[in-house]
């Protein structure tokens, strides 16, 4: 066969067929519609030699991946539901031909086996995977606002049972090898070195027979194989899905309906319905927005933020053993695989940071993600003290001390005195201008802002903030480090609030205005949850800390003007020691680590009588419009480099609803004329803070959009 083909078929002397997958010119194997002709030639050869073949082994020639999924770019070419349905049907037919082969087929899996890759493997009789860390199996289509469209919704429940299949497909979670074996997704997990040998031996052990129908556990039979049991499962799943998605993600409901339809009407009807619903989802606004995030994330992986080669980073120093410092040290060791030296003014601070890391690693050990030896190996990469011992080896030092300008300037001086001349100093400030922190530095070209979000091990965004004389190499180095830490970095201009806090502040201020107008706290939070935010603004203030808000807002008012002046609630709350969760009381009451309910006494403190006057949409738009306005100002002032960066920063930094694609894509969807119209209406009703900025007015007048 042609070596330029993605699928290469060969035969060994024992009459086994081997189908190797190697998409030419690509790092990852993906399935593409253009491969259909190749696969038809493969099936023709296999059927022609059917009497001589004992079995077929499918494997990848890529060193670290099986099939990462279908090429999502194919969907962008679909102009109609009909075209998208034809695409899904083509994939289904190809995998059905694989399932219908008269001899057994085994998929030998190493590396990611996701989406269409797993659907191909599910069409095989058997599956063997490596136990390597790189091996992951899953159906993540729901993350793109889709459902598995090549048989996944029909084959997975029949293989492992309805309950575990619903969990995998609705969440899009990816399984490690041992978990996949435990659930029955694969038949064996083995060392990489023997993968192909074991795959072939499995066919021999099975007597070269096709797989018999899987026998599911008795509980699964009672629940999923009876009409009443199925109804109970799907009713419960629909209820949980609605609670989680609040109706904003149509793919989740479609997944439930397609799986239920297939179990009740049979495999053939289920596949037809799967293709139909898949196609409908492809054309939805939600899926298009989620796919735009996927493409943007992929693009950003190649973006170093500057035209320079990043310097190697073999060791990192962290100043401050608090929550931020501990989290930064964790992602550096766990994700970036780089050793860390922690410095704190007190031994207790260092011990707290080490203990924080140990607890996170131990959770992974308890979940069988790490062995005890691996946990110890990770902890051995962490050390610390109250002095600067070891900092002469650090290539990057990340500062996470208190938000005090003089203290941070002293940290710069200390590192310049105790580290290499080439050491980069990255400050994790959330509000102080980077040029001020660098103002007394001997080597200002090595200084850059690196703003993480709390908790660091969970929040995916980091803002990289160069000041006027930060070198391109410094920018490229910290962008590369942040990406290795598992973060999505965006490069933003050095100004008050940077980007994320600057667009968050007007949103939070308006939420406070709505509250002070008498809207009940729970109503206000629920309105933004329904809109698609992960938490409501009042809950967010409690989580971040009222004291943090009280520090940031005056800086923004001083630097950017009176539109950042919110209602005077911070001082009143802080006088009553209401800092939020950290102090055990804020707008909500807390018991241990759990939020309980609205603390009704806060109304009396703020001299309010709660009374609902606005509907949910009115509340949401009041909070959202100032954020959209400020995002446009940030773009026009060069705070962010593009609408893409602005959207990714909002989604990954503050949880802007992903199904809307970010503030800029959302404005494009609404139409800028409509956005201006809404802002003008709010200006008349609530004041000048809603007046649309010049950039919005100009674009709306010219009929422009933020994206082509």
From Swiss-Prot:
Keywords: Cytoplasm, Fatty acid metabolism, Isomerase, Lipid degradation, Lipid metabolism, Lyase, Multifunctional enzyme, NAD, Oxidoreductase. GO terms for biological process: fatty acid beta-oxidation. PROSITE patterns: 3HCDH, ENOYL_COA_HYDRATASE. GO terms for molecular function: 3-hydroxybutyryl-CoA epimerase activity; enoyl-CoA hydratase activity; long-chain-3-hydroxyacyl-CoA dehydrogenase activity; NAD+ binding. Residues 311-708 are annotated as: 3-hydroxyacyl-CoA dehydrogenase. It comes from the Bacteria. Pathway: Lipid metabolism; fatty acid beta-oxidation. It is found in: Cytoplasm. The record marks 119, 141 as: Important for catalytic activity. Residues 1-191 are annotated as: Enoyl-CoA hydratase. Pfam families: 3HCDH, 3HCDH_N, ECH_1. The keyword Metal-binding does not apply. One of its GO terms (cellular component) is cytoplasm. It catalyses: a (3S)-3-hydroxyacyl-CoA = a (2E)-enoyl-CoA + H2O; a 4-saturated-(3S)-3-hydroxyacyl-CoA = a (3E)-enoyl-CoA + H2O; a (3S)-3-hydroxyacyl-CoA + NAD(+) = a 3-oxoacyl-CoA + NADH + H(+); (3S)-3-hydroxybutanoyl-CoA = (3R)-3-hydroxybutanoyl-CoA. Its EC number is 4.2.1.17, 5.1.2.3, 1.1.1.35. Catalyzes the formation of a hydroxyacyl-CoA by addition of water on enoyl-CoA. Also exhibits 3-hydroxyacyl-CoA epimerase and 3-hydroxyacyl-CoA dehydrogenase activities. Heterotetramer of two alpha chains (FadJ) and two beta chains (FadI). PANTHER family: TRIFUNCTIONAL ENZYME SUBUNIT ALPHA, TRIFUNCTIONAL ENZYME SUBUNIT ALPHA, MITOCHONDRIAL. NCBIfam families: FadJ (TIGR02440), PRK11154.1 (NF008363). In the N-terminal section; belongs to the enoyl-CoA hydratase/isomerase family. In the central section; belongs to the 3-hydroxyacyl-CoA dehydrogenase family. This is Fatty acid oxidation complex subunit alpha. The gene is fadJ.
């Amino acid at each position: 066969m042609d070596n330029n083909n993605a699928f290469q078929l060969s035969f060994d002397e024992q009459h086994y067929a081997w189908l190797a997958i190697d998409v030419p010119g690509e790092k990852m194997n993906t399935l593409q519609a253009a491969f259909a002709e190749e696969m038809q030639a493969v099936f023709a050869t296999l059927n022609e030699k059917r009497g001589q073949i004992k079995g077929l082994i499918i494997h990848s020639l890529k060193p670290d991946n099986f099939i990462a999924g279908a090429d999502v770019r194919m969907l962008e070419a679909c102009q109609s539901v009909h075209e998208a349905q034809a695409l899904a049907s083509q994939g289904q037919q190809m995998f059905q031909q694989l399932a219908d082969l008269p001899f057994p087929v085994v998929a030998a899996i190493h590396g990611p086996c996701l989406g269409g890759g797993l659907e191909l493997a599910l069409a095989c009789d058997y599956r063997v995977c490596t136990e390597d860390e790189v091996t992951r199996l899953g159906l993540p289509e729901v993350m793109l606002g889709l459902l598995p469209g090549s048989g996944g919704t029909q084959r997975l429940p029949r293989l492992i049972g309805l309950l575990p299949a619903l969990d995998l497909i609705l969440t899009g979670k990816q399984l490690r090898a041992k978990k996949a074996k435990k659930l029955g997704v694969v038949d064996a997990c083995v060392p990489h070195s023997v993968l192909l040998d074991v795959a072939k031996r499995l066919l021999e052990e099975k007597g070269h027979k096709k797989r018999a129908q899987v026998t599911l556990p008795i509980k699964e039979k009672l629940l999923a194989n009876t009409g009443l049991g199925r109804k109970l499962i799907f009713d419960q799943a629909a209820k949980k899905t609605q609670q989680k998605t609040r109706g904003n993600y149509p793919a989740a409901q479609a997944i439930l309906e397609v799986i239920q339809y297939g179990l009740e009407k049979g495999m053939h009807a289920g596949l037809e319905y799967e293709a139909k619903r898949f196609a409908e989802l492809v054309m939805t606004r939600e899926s298009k927005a989620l796919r735009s995030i996927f493409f943007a994330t992929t693009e950003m992986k190649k973006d170093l933020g500057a035209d320079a080669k990043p310097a190697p980073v073999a060791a990192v120093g962290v100043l401050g053993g608090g929550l931020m410092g501990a989290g930064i040290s964790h992602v550096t060791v766990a994700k970036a695989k780089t050793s860390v030296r922690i410095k704190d003014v007190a031994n207790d601070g260092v011990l707290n940071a080490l203990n924080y890391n140990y607890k996170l690693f131990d959770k992974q050990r308890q979940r069988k993600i790490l062995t005890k030896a691996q946990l110890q190996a990770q902890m051995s990469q962490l050390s610390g003290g109250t002095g600067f011992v070891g900092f002469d080896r650090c290539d990057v030092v990340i500062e996470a001390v208190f938000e005090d300008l003089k203290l941070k300037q002293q940290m710069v001086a200390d590192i310049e005195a105790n580290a290499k001349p080439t050491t980069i100093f990255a400050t994790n400030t959330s509000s102080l201008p980077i040029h001020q922190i660098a103002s007394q530095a001997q080597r200002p070209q090595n200084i850059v802002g690196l703003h993480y979000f709390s908790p660091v091990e969970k929040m995916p965004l980091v803002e990289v903030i160069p000041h006027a004389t930060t070198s391109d190499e410094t920018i490229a180095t910290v962008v590369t480090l942040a990406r290795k830490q598992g973060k999505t970095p965006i490069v933003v201009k050095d100004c008050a609030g940077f980007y994320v806090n600057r667009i968050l502040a007007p949103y939070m201020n308006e939420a406070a205005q709505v509250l002070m107008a008498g809207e009940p706290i729970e109503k206000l939070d629920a309105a933004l949850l329904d809109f698609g935010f992960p938490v409501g603004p009042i809950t967010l203030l409690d989580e971040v800390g009222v004291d943090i808000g009280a520090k940031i807002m005056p800086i923004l008012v001083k630097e950017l003007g009176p539109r950042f002046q919110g209602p005077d609630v911070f001082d009143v709350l802080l006088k009553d020691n209401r800092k939020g969760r950290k102090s055990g009381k804020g707008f909500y009451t807390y018991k241990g680590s759990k939020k309980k309910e609205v603390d009704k006494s806060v109304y009396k403190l703020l001299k309010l009588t709660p009374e609902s006057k606005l509907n949910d949409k009115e509340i949401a738009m009041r909070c959202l419009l100032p954020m959209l306005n400020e995002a446009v100002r940030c773009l026009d002032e060069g705070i962010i480099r593009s609408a893409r960066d602005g959207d990714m920063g909002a989604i990954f930094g503050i949880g802007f609803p992903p199904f809307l694609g970010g503030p800029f894509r959302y404005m494009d969807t609404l139409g800028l004329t409509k956005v201006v119209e809404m802002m003008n209406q709010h200006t008349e009703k609530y004041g000048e803070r809603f007046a649309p900025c010049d950039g919005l007015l100009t674009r709306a007048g010219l009929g422009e959009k933020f994206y082509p």
